[in-house]
Amino acid sequence: LEGQEFFDKLLEELNVKYLAFQEDLAKIPKTGPFILVANHPLGALDGVIMCKILSEIRPDFKVMANFLLTKIEPMAPYVISVNPFEGRKEAYSSMSGMREALRHLSEGNCLGIFPAGEVSNKNNEFHEILDKEWESTALKLIKKANVPVVPMYFHAKNSKFFYSASKIHPDLQTLLLPSEMVNK
């Protein structure tokens, strides 16, 4: 399976249902470059849903996401990979992803990003499920690209256990993401 067939089958197998309002979809530019910015409450599933929705409207859509998604062959054409596990933000694989993203936009295409760079959690002063502050690299990309920015919001959350575990150690959050994906 590939493209829309892949996204449809994956979401069906995971029993994931989502709602996208037509009046919001109508605001997505049909031509020209833009950056779609979104919160990141679920993990990989956000990227899958984003690709499903946007690639129906814009076949040139790609998302900047975890390089592991490119290991899923039908996802690879939609992903500009970055490595969120690097200690140094300036590491080569993420910088090459940044260059690829800018090239993709300069060719008139559209790009989705999760500017916080990691999945939302409750480890904040409000004890609410929130994205952390946007990564400086995301802000630099937006500024350097100088294209319209379109917001997308996922109204979703992971399990209570996920948020509790992330308080114990942040890496537990990462380890639990695959199980969260299949338990929606």
Where are these regions (language model features)?
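A cross-family acyltransferase "interaction/gating" segment
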Residues: 110, 122-184
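Short amphipathic alpha-helices and their capping/turn segments at secondary-structure boundaries
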Residues: 97-107
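A short secondary-structure junction signal
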Residues: 47-49, 74-76, 115-116, 122-127, ...
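A structural motif
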Residues: 107-118
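Active-site glycine-rich loop that binds ribose-phosphate moieties when present
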Residues: 88-98, 130-136
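Catalytic core of membrane glycerolipid acyltransferases/transacylases, capturing the structured
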Residues: 35-91
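Hydrophobic/aromatic ligand-binding patch that stacks against planar heteroaromatic rings
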Residues: 53, 103, 140-141
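Membrane-anchoring hydrophobic helices of lipid-metabolizing enzymes
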Residues: 1-37, 47-49, 56-58, 76-77
